[in-house]
Amino acid sequence: MMNRKILLVVSASLLGWSLSQASITSVPTWNYSGGFYCYAPVFTAADQTVDLTGHQSSFGALGLSILTDTPTDPTLTINNSINNTSSFAWTEYIVSVAMNQSFTINSAGVVAPGGWTASITQPGAPVAGIYTGIIDYLGGTPVSIYPLLNSSLNFGYQVTFSGSTSYSLTQTANPVPEPGAWGFLTTGGLLMGGWTLARRRQVRLQRIA
């Protein structure tokens, strides 16, 4: 697994930091579901980052709890290094970020593979108390199937939030295959299904005979 980080060198004034800004004190719990597996997050208080490493075989989600010392505008940088253990190469990776307090997303990007871009849709009005934003990462060099070359997607983003000293964050990720791959996979599934039905019909005819 590639052990790279997105290093965001931004002045305190640019991030809107002030003497009254909160500090994140810990990321005490995490969970994962679906086709996503994550090792224990590594939180670094000095630079307010959390590093996430894991692997993904299909649509899945990761949840974090975040604690701060005051409720005033902390910023957390989230770095991900995810191995592709699915059955197809990724050329797009759509991340949904949801929190239980209002927040903004900034500085989204990909370290590796090269050539990827990121577009951000900021959270709108809450639904059932949950605010949700979207980051669409678009390739670039495809993320190949692990353990081939370029089989880890190393990406990151920042979230700035406020309103509490205890937060929940859910990162839901949907990897997208190369154009035409869905057709190939669907055709393969249809062919397999057709072969199975034909085989069952043949067995029934043999029994009748």
Can you annotate each of these PLM segments?
Residues 1-7:
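Bacterial N-terminal signal peptides that target proteins for export
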Residues 9-16:
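Bacterial N-terminal signal peptides
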Residues 194-209:
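C-terminal membrane-anchoring or membrane-association module
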Residues 17-22:
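Sec/Tat signal peptide C-region and signal peptidase I cleavage site
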Residues 23-175:
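Mature extracellular "passenger" or substrate-interacting domains of secreted, surface-exposed proteins
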Residues 178-197:
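A short, hydrophobic C-terminal helix/tail in secreted or cell-surface proteins
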